[in-house]
């Protein structure tokens, strides 16, 4: 009996050492990622906050001085020159996404390039967003931090996602959505949970840093939210289906304009000048500056006041496609918010549901349609609009995700699992 007990003791001690070693490894790994996440959140938070402040300044200046809009061709020429000179291989957000699945790096020069070029685009009134630029900015900085700390390839991929989340959170003030977005957008159908802790921590720190820097988080007050019934639920399904259709049209418009530019305007300098002239003519014809920049003013009117002109969504879609595919920089995410909010708002005239809730749900639904990120879309709706209309947002996002098919803003986004059955398909989005 004593011999048996004596034999068990070394085995128990061995098992104890085994578990202690694993706990030590896990704790070391956790501490490593906490430190890296804090550093990423602070560094990306600072750069992104500075980016947001400068962006706000140039936007306000352009709003007060309409003549700046006529400098759009000049801004475009500067942007083309910068990318021809320093960043010919820069692939924008697509390059950041492909980096996470490959051995490639995000060039550090992407950070100053996207910073300056987005500022120039917004200064002159191009129809572009800012989150796309922030994602590239954060991904570039995150990758560079990973290189400085001599991290291996897999860890650098996590650092890219960490930087993306931090930048998105700092610029838009939605840490929950930002933390999930970078893990969800790369491969639809799977989540990179290895990045959960660093993305969450970096996102929160960057958001708080930005708030201390004077960057107020975006939020909108949704009014007149009706009780969810079978009737109102079915009406929201119609809104979601319509927004999914518009999301497909938006993606097709971006691709179509890109092909037209490539066919008829091969020289990038001529292309951006010609596109600027077209944008200026359309804007003067419409006699409004509402479609310049990201479109926050139209979102606010649609969501909080239930006001949108019948063709607001159309002109924002057209001008964004003309701007972004000409070579201007910024991103399509906030314009997609604007298109969804204004289109959802006018759906009220067809279905008789509150224009405010239609605008809010339409914004989330269209964002989901173009990014294929339903969890992020739900979270961003909660953070921007609160939880009172949660049921409507859930309906809108889920229906839009299913109906929008395999279209998307990013050609390097991979659809790993089918949207319609538990089936591995591993295909790229239709772009």
Kindly label every feature range from the protein language model.
Residues 1-431:
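Alpha-helical transmembrane segments and immediately membrane-proximal extracytoplasmic
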């Amino acid at each position: 009996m004593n011999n048996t007990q004596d034999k068990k003791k070394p085995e128990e001690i061995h098992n104890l050492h085994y578990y202690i070693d694993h706990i030590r490894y896990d704790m070391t790994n956790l501490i490593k990622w906490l430190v890296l996440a804090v550093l990423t959140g602070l560094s990306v938070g600072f750069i992104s906050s500075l980016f947001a402040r400068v962006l706000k300044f140039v936007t306000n200046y352009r709003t007060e001085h309409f003549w700046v809009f006529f400098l759009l061709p000049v801004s475009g020429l500067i942007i083309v020159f910068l990318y021809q000179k320093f960043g010919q291989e820069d692939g924008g957000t697509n390059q950041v996404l492909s980096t996470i699945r490959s051995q490639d790096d995000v060039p550090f020069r992407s950070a100053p390039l996207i910073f300056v070029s987005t500022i120039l685009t917004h200064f002159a009134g191009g129809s572009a967003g800012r989150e796309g630029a922030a994602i590239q900015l954060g991904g570039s900085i995150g990758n560079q931090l990973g290189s400085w700390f001599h991290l291996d390839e897999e860890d650098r991929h996590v650092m890219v996602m960490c930087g993306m989340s931090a930048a998105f959170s700092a610029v838009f003030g939605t840490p929950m959505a930002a933390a999930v977005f970078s893990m969800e957008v790369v491969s639809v159908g799977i989540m990179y949970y290895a990045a959960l802790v660093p993305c969450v921590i970096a996102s929160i720190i960057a958001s708080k840093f930005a708030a201390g820097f004077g960057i107020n988080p975006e939020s909108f007050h949704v009014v007149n939210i009706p009780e969810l019934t079978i009737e109102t639920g079915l009406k929201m399904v119609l809104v979601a289906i319509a927004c999914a259709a518009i999301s497909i049209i938006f993606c097709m418009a971006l691709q179509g304009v890109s092909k037209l530019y490539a066919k008829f305007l091969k020289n990038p300098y001529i292309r951006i000048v010609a596109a600027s002239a077209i944008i200026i003519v359309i804007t003067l014809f419409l006699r409004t500056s509402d479609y310049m920049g990201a479109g926050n003013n139209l979102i606010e009117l649609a969501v909080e006041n239930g006001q949108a002109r019948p063709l607001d969504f159309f002109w924002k879609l057209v001008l964004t496609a003309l701007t972004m595919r000409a070579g201007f920089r910024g991103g399509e995410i906030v314009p997609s918010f604007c298109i969804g909010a204004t289109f959802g708002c006018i759906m009220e005239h067809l279905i008789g549901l509150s224009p405010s809730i239609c605008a809010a749900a339409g914004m989330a639904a269209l964002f989901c349609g173009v990014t294929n990120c339903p969890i992020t879309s739900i979270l961003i709706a909660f953070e921007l609009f609160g939880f009172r209309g949660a049921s409507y947002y859930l309906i809108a996002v889920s229906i839009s995700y299913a109906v929008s098919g395999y279209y998307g803003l990013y050609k390097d986004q991979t659809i790993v699992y089918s949207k319609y059955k538990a089936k591995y398909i591993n295909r790229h989005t239709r772009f």
